[in-house]
Curated annotation (Swiss-Prot):
Keyword Magnesium belongs to the record: no
Gene that this polypeptide is encoded by: PSAK
The protein's name: Photosystem I reaction center subunit psaK, chloroplastic
A GO-annotated cellular component: chloroplast thylakoid membrane
Topology relative to the membrane: Multi-pass membrane protein
GO biological process: photosynthesis
Keyword Phosphoprotein: no
Similarity comment: family membership: Belongs to the PsaG/PsaK family.
Record Pfam families: PSI_PSAK
S-S bonds: none
Ranges annotated as spanning the membrane: 49-69, 95-120
Taxonomy of the source species: Eukaryota, Viridiplantae, Streptophyta, Embryophyta, Tracheophyta
Localization, UniProt: Plastid, Chloroplast thylakoid membrane
Organelle transit peptide residues: 1-42
Alphabetically ordered keywords of this record: Chloroplast, Membrane, Photosynthesis, Photosystem I, Plastid, Thylakoid, Transit peptide, Transmembrane, Transmembrane helix
Amino acid sequence: MASQLSAMTSVPQFHGLRTYSSPRSMATLPSLRRRRSQGIRCDYIGSSTNLIMVTTTTLMLFAGRFGLAPSANRKATAGLKLEARESGLQTGDPAGFTLADTLACGAVGHIMGVGIVLGLKNTGVLDQIIG
């Protein structure tokens, strides 16, 4: 076993900080096959990936704006009922939808969209939709 390991690679020899020659492999090691990373392409505006992302972000913003999701001015109680409270944030929106609510709902919508896209890609359904 030790002779096989020593025969696979040679030890480089040094003189100071420089090597005499580059180490050469006496035997080639089998190449390891790597798993390809998955990628998502969003080629055009009407692509399925783009439609999924726009839909989930829009639905989450709609839910936050019209009181279907917790926001800065509506907190969720133990029974998941939403009750109004004063947050101290100024807004020009009649429903009280603030900038923080917009950013939070947009981020959650994107997270949901990415989860849906990657899930469909992993199951192979998104490949069938694309072509």
